Amino acid sequence: MKITFVGEAVSGFGGMETVISNVIHTFENSSPKINCEMFFFCRNDKMDKAWLKEIKYAQSFSNIKLSFLRRAKHVYNFSQWLKETSPDIVICIDVISCLYANKARKKSGKQFTIFSWPHFSLDHKKHAECITYADYHLAISSGIKEQMMARGISAQNISVVYNPVSIKTIIVPSPERDKPAVFLYVGRLKFEGQKRVKDLFDGLARTTGEWQLHIIGDGSDFEKCQAYSREL
């Protein structure tokens, strides 16, 4: 079975890359009959590719400013690639790729099943309506499943799969009674939107007892988050 993961270029340093890489390696290690590849729609060649070291991938490049022409080039390039590779399943890691995959399938004349596998809330994503171009859907939370259904997708075509995690035997001990509780946040600093660091601050502000919050990360809302934390 050939499985292709498609999507717009990512940074190469995020959690989504880790999840996708783990899933691909799990698939391929579980059966020699499963072959996975990736296909990216790119505007430039800035994506860090260290995470793709053991993953076969291809890219379509287009920096055309007019969106409909840029999309047309990506669809054409992907359709040509589909003719050569003939995947059985295409899994779209973002919403716009559902549109690309659907149009490329028609253009290539190939038959395969399209799954959407969005890693972000649909309520905060541009082109969220494009998710309806997929045949079936993988939701990483019950909330995203509800967002899919709100866009007219049947619950029968949605599977809630959550995010894969590695099993650890290490247990983080509870804080000692005379020591403050220590919380750790690792990730992008988005005040609201996808990450909603504001909710973390609001929740901790209502917490009784001594505690500490350590934050590792950066983002466009760094100063906003910092200022809000001082107000509480």
Can you annotate each of these PLM segments?
Residues 90-91, 134-142, 159:
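A short beta-strand/loop micro-motif in the catalytic core of glycosyltransferases
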Residues 79-80, 120-137, 151:
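Membrane-proximal helix-turn-helix segments that form the acceptor-binding/catalytic region
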Residues 6-14, 18-72, 81, 219-221:
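N-terminal strand-loop element at the rim of the active site
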Residues 31-37, 201-232:
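A conserved nucleotide-sugar
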